[in-house]
Design a protein with these regions (language model features):
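Membrane-proximal, glycine/serine-rich, low-complexity loop/turn segments characteristic
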Residues: 20-34, 44, 56, 73-76, ...
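A short, solvent-exposed loop/turn motif at the edges and junctions
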Residues: 59-64, 86, 90-102
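Short, acidic Ser/Thr/Gly-rich low-complexity loop/linker segments typical of extracellular
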Residues: 60-76
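Outer-membrane beta-barrel translocator domains and adjoining extracellular loop/strand segments
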Residues: 226-228, 265-268, 296, 305-313, ...
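Outer membrane beta-barrel strand-and-loop segments of large Gram-negative receptors
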Residues: 385, 516-518, 561-563, 666-668, ...
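Signature of Gram-negative outer-membrane beta-barrel scaffolds
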Residues: 532-635, 843
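C-terminal beta-barrel architecture of Gram-negative outer-membrane proteins
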Residues: 831-899
């Protein structure tokens, strides 16, 4: 009996124990299970659903946002995966009084019913006036553009938004200028975004996620820490401030486009491209520690809109610039993929990393008309047609590591790597005629080339502050760059002079390498509360090597076109400055001394030549920097400094360039570094009562030993040129004035005015008569330079013994624009008119003086309906006066587009250049010639696209997709 009793007791204890376990598991499940919360957001008066309302949860007694979403088009809200517990529900929408209420969530699905928001008239009026009127603000060294004040469509990208903003310019390569000054980098929320690739942000970030664009003229991280300013320490940063709903969570879009191009451009400037396509993907995720952005795109045509206008360029005659001009225009097939990560996960550090791949395949074509000036003779006229293809692949890897706590110690490490491969082919056909139209010469030349290169560069900086005394600092920065390239090319040509025809076929193997190590050591000794004495020493050593081995068509070596050169460049820069800093105001002044040594060693035809060995150049300049910010929205900046520039590698290469047999050049191993004095003045004023803004800027440059080309023609009309230093300094002065003001009670009409003027005076060297050409069959570089240049100082050239005279060129360019923009809630219209006048005056040959006029009229219309339709049109009309025959014809560009938003999707149809009149025109003016050129363009085409917005960009977003993306972080 006792045994039975014990057995029963044990059984009961066992059952009881299991029962307790079951109860405990049930409690744990209840406490940790997730539920769904749903609600409906409506207007309290009309009971209409309110889309895009911000809805988020805070745990009771905490300000942390644990769940965040937006209401969809029907005003419905679903918040998944909410742990049971007590929360405060927050519902907010601009123009309405926020709703807040505490709840205790326990059920599997909590239906909170309808949340009705009450309108707040004061907020609505203030928001509408501020959004439209206060478009640009000035706060000390920062220009703040309010994105809401510039009406762009729902499909617009960041590039489209920036082009609407006063003073902003966006180049074809993605470079951005503000009031004529280039932006050094683009950041998002103060974080690095794809480092030195501005197009990544411009072409991939949607405009509607941007709240403000801040253009900040600031000191870099090293200078801000040390309190020491130098000529290289300031940078202009464009920071994108996102709207609140995009600062946390995931968002993105995917787009596919297809289209058709019916025509072929006239006069050989076209290809057989008819089928068009495009696609892009952008995914971005943000949380408290990480910012991750993934982008991918590819296209052979951009979306219609912004088809461009004439491009007008007036430049000095520079070898590299002329090569760059030949690449303008054309039809590109491009692709890009990349990832950018900003993270705070490394303890005590902020880190940024990006990797990107870029592909480009371009078909280009150019038609040129050139009038060449000959002193004492009638001009020569050259007409040419150039076509070509180029393909490139580039991989870029960047990393940046910054110390967070910079109160005492600063550390920055920024390495970068580049891998590049490229290939190109070109064909140039041209003829030269005299004033009577009789042909003098002609050529048909082709070239193909390929190259591969690698570059590793970086920056390491460290410093300490408050060393035994407040504000005393010591900072060291080291920069490095190592690169290597290999390539090959083939050139074939037929050149005729009357009845004489000269064929040529050459093959080249090329190689290049470069090394650069530089650094800056700075020390600040403070005295008093605001003053300090700074000493800065800057040094840079750079070595460049170039090898070029030439071979004839039969494979035998051609020593006349082969060469080897090495350039060693050393720069030492010392600066002593007095500095005054109080809050945002500063006044720096001092003296800087630049010492440069430029040594060139070359080998041609088995002979070695050395120049510049042990020769030092000394340049002195003052250093001034004044920055003042007033309390009434005023900002003043003044700076003066000097900088030294090394000659480009192609300018010192001692070998003939005969890729165009009618345009032959060689380098100059005796070139010396140039030195530029730069002065800038600017004043900005923002009236916070009228929301008006005015900006005035003035930039002046004086360049000593500037590099230009000395050119001449031979008896057959072939042009030759060699780079030389100028004896007299070149000067330029550029001024900008812009004004913008909204008018009316509701600030719906905005008026704007801008004027830009440029005055320049430069030196050129022209032959006083026709000269003998270079011996293309047996070119002896040393013998040629002895006759053309003389000794290392250019005794024969500058004295005029080799037949050249100095010519002074004066140029003026004035560009004026007036604009009126009217905006309603869903409609906007912009009218703009522009006039540009360019004049050139030449001392050596006044008959070559020029006077050109360009006129442009622009109309932009945008209308959005309540049902998600968007209609947009852009019309531009251009007129010309004073150009050669065939280049004065007016033309009109007309773009149309229509789109419809359907929940998370947007479908659109656009037609570019409806009248098929688009053209790309460049205009080059200098002392030697005037050239106009047309380049290949797309012409009329149509594109249909489908875009899907997901995450926070989709008001009816899918919770499963949102959660899956969130788990990627």
């Amino acid at each position: 009996m006792k045994r039975i009793t014990l057995a029963l007791l044990g059984l009961l204890l066992t059952v009881s124990a299991h029962a307790q376990v079951v109860v405990m598991d049930s409690d744990m499940f209840e406490r940790n299970r997730n539920i769904r919360v749903k609600l409906l957001v409506q207007d309290a008066r009309s009971e209409e659903p309110l889309p895009f309302a911000t809805v988020y949860l805070n745990p009771q007694g905490d300000t942390t946002i644990t769940h965040f979403t937006l209401s969809d088009q029907k005003g419905e809200v679903l918040i998944p995966d909410v742990p049971v517990g007590r929360y405060r529900l927050n519902v907010e929408l601009i123009g309405y009084t926020p709703f807040r209420k505490d709840y205790n969530f326990r059920n599997y699905e909590e239906d909170l019913g309808t949340i009705k928001l009450e309108e707040n008239p004061e907020i609505i009026d203030a928001a509408s006036i501020t959004a439209v009127g206060n478009a640009v603000e000035v706060r000390q060294d920062t220009l703040i553009y309010n994105a809401a004040a510039f009406h762009v469509g729902d499909n617009a990208m960041l590039e489209d938004l920036i082009k609407k903003m006063p003073g902003m310019e966006v180049g074809d390569d993605g470079t951005v200028k503000v009031n004529g000054e280039p932006v050094d980098k683009i950041t998002v929320g103060g974080k690095t975004f794809f480092f030195n690739d501005p197009s990544a942000a411009l072409k991939n970030l949607p405009a509607k996620i941007v709240d403000k664009i801040k253009v900040i003229d600031q000191e870099n991280k090293e200078a801000a820490f040390s309190g020491i300013a130098s000529q290289d320490s300031r940078e202009k940063v464009m920071d994108l401030e996102l709207k609140e709903e995009y600062k946390q969570g995931w968002f993105g879009n995917a787009k596919l486009s297809g289209g058709y191009r019916p025509g072929v451009n006239e006069e050989g400037l076209g290809d057989d491209r008819h089928a068009l396509y495009g696609g892009n993907l952008m995914v971005s995720g943000y949380n408290e520690k990480d910012q991750l952005t993934l982008i991918a795109n590819g296209q052979n045509a951009s979306d219609p809109g912004g088809s461009g206008s004439s491009v007008f360029i007036s430049v000095e005659d520079d070898l590299e610039m002329l090569d760059a001009l030949s690449l303008l225009g054309g039809m590109k097939t491009t692709a890009m993929a990349g990832a950018n990560l900003n993270s705070d996960r490394i303890k005590g550090m902020e880190s940024s990393a990006s990797v990107s791949y870029n592909f480009s395949d371009q078909i280009s074509g150019t038609r040129t008309a050139r009038e060449s000036m000959l002193v004492g003779e009638n001009p020569l006229f050259t007409n040419g047609l150039t076509s070509g293809t180029s393909r490139s692949n580039r991989v870029s890897v960047n990393f940046e590591l910054n110390r967070k706590d910079t109160r005492k110690i600063n550390f920055v490490f920024r390495p970068a790597f580049r891998f590049n491969s490229s290939a190109s082919t070109s064909r140039n056909q041209s003829t030269t005629t005299d004033v009577l139209g009789e042909e003098i010469n002609g050529t048909d030349a082709g070239k193909s080339s390929s190259s591969r290169s690698f570059q590793a560069s970086g920056r390491i900086s460290g410093g300490v502050r408050d060393i035994g005394k407040e504000r005393r600092s010591l900072n060291l920065t080291v920069n490095y760059n190592f690169n290597r390239s290999l390539g090959e090319s083939r050139e074939d040509s037929r050149t005729w002079y009357g009845a004489t025809v000269t064929p040529r076929n050459l093959h080249y193997d090329t190689g290049g390498s470069g090394k650069m190590v530089g650094g800056e050591l700075s020390y600040l000794e403070p005295f008093g509360q605001y003053w300090g004495l700074a000493a800065i020493v800057n040094a840079r050593w750079q070595q460049r090597g170039n090898d070029k081995a030439a071979f004839n068509a039969d494979g035998s070596a051609n020593d006349y076109y082969s060469s080897r050169s090495r350039n060693d460049y050393l720069l030492l820069n010392q600066s002593l400055q007095m500095q005054y800093r109080k809050e945002s105001n500063q006044f720096y002044f001092g003296l800087q001394h630049a010492q440069t040594r430029n040594e060139v060693r070359s080998r041609t035809l088995g002979r070695d030549t050395e120049t510049g060995i042990g020769e030092w150049l000394h340049d002195w300049s003052p250093y001034v920097s004044i920055r003042w910010s007033g309390k009434e929205g005023q900002s003043v900046r003044v700076s003066y400094q000097g900088s030294s520039s090394q000659p480009a590698a192609v300018q010192i290469h001692p070998v003939l360039d005969i890729s165009n047999p009618l345009e032959i050049s060689t380098g100059n191993i005796y070139l010396r570094p140039s030195f530029r004095h730069s002065l800038s003045l600017s004043w900005d004023f923002n009236n916070r009562k009228t929301f008006s803004n005015i900006s005035v800027s003035l930039f002046g440059d004086m360049t000593q030993r500037g590099i230009v080309s000395a050119s001449w023609f031979d008896a057959d009309g072939v042009r030759y040129f060699v780079p030389v230093n100028t004896r007299k300094p070149s000067t330029s002065l550029t001024g900008y004035v812009s004004w913008r003001r909204p008018v009316g009670e509701k600030k719906r009409l905005t008026l704007g005015f801008g004027i830009q003027g440029n005055l320049s005076s430069s030196t050129h060297y022209q032959a006083t008569s026709r000269q003998s050409g270079m011996d293309l069959l047996a070119f002896d570089y040393n013998a040629f330079m002895a006759d053309f240049w003389g000794d290392a100082g250019g005794s024969r050239f500058y004295s005029g013994q080799s037949g050249f005279s100095e010519s002074r060129t004066s140029q003026s360019d004035i560009y004026t624009t007036m604009q009126a923009a009217y905006r309603l809630d869903r409609f906007s219209v912009t009218l703009r008119s522009a006039i540009e006048n360019e004049r050139s005056r030449y001392s050596l040959d006044p008959t070559a003086n020029t006077d050109y006029w360009r006129f442009g009229q622009y109309l932009d219309l945008l209308y959005e309906t309540l049902h998600g339709w968007e209609f947009k049109t852009e019309v531009s009309f251009f007129q010309f006066r004073g150009y050669p025959a065939g280049f004065n014809e007016p033309y009109c560009l007309w773009d149309l587009s229509v789109s419809k938003n359907i929940n998370a999707f947007t479908v659109s149809l656009g037609i570019s250049d409806l009248l098929n009149q688009q053209r790309m025109q460049q205009h080059t003016v200098n002392a030697e010639y005037i050239e106009d050129r047309y380049s290949l363009v797309m012409g009329r085409y149509a594109m249909f696209s489908l875009k899907w917005s997901f995450g926070k960009m989709n008001p009816a977003k899918n919770a499963r997709v949102q959660n899956a993306m969130y788990n990627m972080l």
